[in-house]
Amino acid sequence: MINTRKTHPLMKIVNNAFIDLPAPSNISSWWNFGSLLGICLILQILTGLFLAMHYTSDTMTAFSSVTHICRDVNYGWIIRYMHANGASMFFICLFMHVGRGLYYGSYTFLETWNIGVILLFTVMATAFVGYVLPWGQMSFWGATVITNLLSAIPYIGTNLVEWIWGGFSVDKATLTRFFAFHFILPFIIAALAMVHLLFLHETGSNNPTGIPSDADKIPFHPYYTIKDILGILLLVLFLMLLVLFAPDLLGDPDNYTPGNPLNTPPHIKPEWYFLFAYAILRSIPNKLGGVLALISSILILILMPLLHTSKQRSMMFRPFSQCLFWILVADLLTLTWIGGQPVEYPFIIIGQLASILYFFIILVLMPITSTIENNLLKW
């Protein structure tokens, strides 16, 4: 009997990616985040589609249309909060996924890693333009402040900002184009995710030991399909707890006030998942320097394969590197906290120290520690 799963042109692709895929037998729950990100993306596209059916991208009616969705549309409130909190879940999974890659040395798959960094930038761009759409105070001023950073680019900066705004300030043209970007970008993310997966399946998955696992592979289905389903159930549980019990926990109260160009909020800050980068941006007194530091804080991930000096791929058997890794995590949490605080003593100095430490750990301490560990292997 001919097995359609293995012969049908379309089914064959699905089969080779999700069913008969040879997977390492020892990958832990840290390898669940790829599938969780896929689920997050599907969820965001679906909830976003239903929101777009009722949303109007006009400065006069945008805020009212979001209120209308929450009050008058059948189950509009749950769709809106699933979309808003779904973004938070997306970023939690994203940070865990990147952290896993750093810890276990997955960045040695160069193409997969670089596409992943591009994906990270694209998701961040999507989240930023999406945050502007409800046209609340924080939406409006967040858009004004962040787009204004481009004016730090020498010579073309001011023209570039006005070109993005579609005028001399954030206004109707800006909102309309941001809605267009927010609609198209998730589909670009989906396409990039497929390329990401394509490159991953060229090499096969990494595993916690960092040692090639060709000698010990198991089929993806049923072993990892059932494991992924457990992860998805936990993700949905956590998301729905957030949506149904504390929908505004991660949001900003200022966004329940319609955007007003004549009234600036006392503390302008982005959503929690951008706070670490925002803290790095604010810790440098110079505008251009801050923008460069902001971009570098993410772009530094591309350098990870070059900074890898260890003879071992994974950090599993490298206790000193493990300590540094967790100090880096603590540093990022500190930056996230600082990003949400007002610009005053002692937060300014803490932010500056945390920013310096962030780059110092990645660029200096990690390569040196790896070299020391290499020498310890000879003892």
Curated annotation (Swiss-Prot):
Question: What cofactor requirement does the entry state?
Answer: heme b
Protein residues bound to a ubiquinone: H201
Instruction: Provide the binding site for heme b b562.
Output: H83, H182
For the keyword Transport, the answer is yes
Concerning InterPro entries, the annotation shows: Cyt_b/b6_C, Cyt_b/b6_C_sf, Cyt_b/b6_N, Cytb/b6-like_sf, Cytochrome_b, Cytochrome_b_C_euk/bac, Cytochrome_b_N_euk/bac, Di-haem_cyt_TM
Give the GO molecular function terms. Answer: metal ion binding; ubiquinol-cytochrome-c reductase activity
| Disulfide partners | none
How are cofactors bound according to the entry's free-text note? Binds 2 heme b groups non-covalently.
Alphabetical GO CC annotations of the entry are: mitochondrial inner membrane; respiratory chain complex III
**Cross-referenced Pfam families:** Cytochrom_B_C, Cytochrome_B
Output one GO BP term.
Answer: mitochondrial electron transport, ubiquinol to cytochrome c
Keyword Electron transport appears in the UniProt entry? yes
- In terms of domain of life, where is this protein from? Eukaryota
Q: Membrane spanning segments where? A: 33-53, 77-98, 113-133, 178-198, 226-246, 288-308, 320-340, 347-367
Q: Where in the cell is it found?
A: Mitochondrion inner membrane
Q: Membrane topology type, per the record?
A: Multi-pass membrane protein
Annotated positions binding heme b b566 = H97, H196
Per its database record, what is this protein's job? Component of the ubiquinol-cytochrome c reductase complex (complex III or cytochrome b-c1 complex) that is part of the mitochondrial respiratory chain. The b-c1 complex mediates electron transfer from ubiquinol to cytochrome c. Contributes to the generation of a proton gradient across the mitochondrial membrane that is then used for ATP synthesis.
Other noteworthy facts: Heme 1 (or BL or b562) is low-potential and absorbs at about 562 nm, and heme 2 (or BH or b566) is high-potential and absorbs at about 566 nm.
Assembly description: The cytochrome bc1 complex contains 11 subunits: 3 respiratory subunits (MT-CYB, CYC1 and UQCRFS1), 2 core proteins (UQCRC1 and UQCRC2) and 6 low-molecular weight proteins (UQCRH/QCR6, UQCRB/QCR7, UQCRQ/QCR8, UQCR10/QCR9, UQCR11/QCR10 and a cleavage product of UQCRFS1). This cytochrome bc1 complex then forms a dimer.
The protein, known as: Cytochrome b
